[in-house]
């Protein structure tokens, strides 16, 4: 199955997007709300769900994961992966689910406001 790719309104291919500041936590929490996952899996899922528009490098992803874990939003434990390697799997805590709801509500409001401005211009 081919995934759709984004093209500009004139049909030209476009470069991949930088993840907007402040949205990485929202995307991490959203992905982990579905199932526990290790860092590489989170990175891969993000690429798939964004139709390959977002690629997060480990230098951005892992500090966010560590901070979310330190803040009590995630819990982690070591497990064997599908190929028998050990990896740290992250899962949401109750505080993480609350944070996700708050982030999501705020993001929906931002999208509504930006869309309103763009359509009203």
Specify the residue positions occupied by each region the protein language model found.
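Amphipathic alpha-helical dimerization/coiled-coil segments
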Residues: 1-10, 97-121
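Accessory beta->alpha helical hairpin/"wing" motif in late/C-terminal subdomains of nucleic-acid enzymes
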Residues: 92-96
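Short beta-strand/turn micro-motifs at beta-sheet edges
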Residues: 14-18, 78-79
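Beta-hairpin "wing" of winged helix-turn-helix
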Residues: 69-86, 91
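Basic amphipathic alpha-helical segments that dock to polyanions
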Residues: 61-68
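A cross-family signal for key residues in well-ordered alpha-helices
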Residues: 30, 44, 66, 101, ...
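N-terminal helix-turn-helix DNA-binding core of bacterial DNA-binding proteins
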Residues: 16-60
């Amino acid at each position: 199955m081919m995934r759709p790719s984004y093209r500009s309104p004139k049909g030209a291919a476009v470069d991949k997007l930088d993840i907007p500041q402040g949205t990485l936590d929202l995307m991490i929490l959203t992905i982990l709300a579905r199932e526990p996952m290790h860092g590489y899996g989170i990175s891969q899922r993000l690429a798939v769900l964004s139709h390959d528009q977002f690629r997060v490098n480990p230098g951005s992803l892992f500090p966010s994961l560590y901070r979310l874990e330190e803040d009590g939003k995630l819990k982690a434990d070591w497990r064997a992966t599908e190929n028998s390697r050990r990896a740290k799997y992250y899962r949401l805590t109750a505080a993480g689910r609350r944070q996700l709801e708050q982030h999501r509500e705020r993001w929906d409001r931002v999208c509504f406001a930006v869309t309103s401005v763009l359509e009203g211009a």
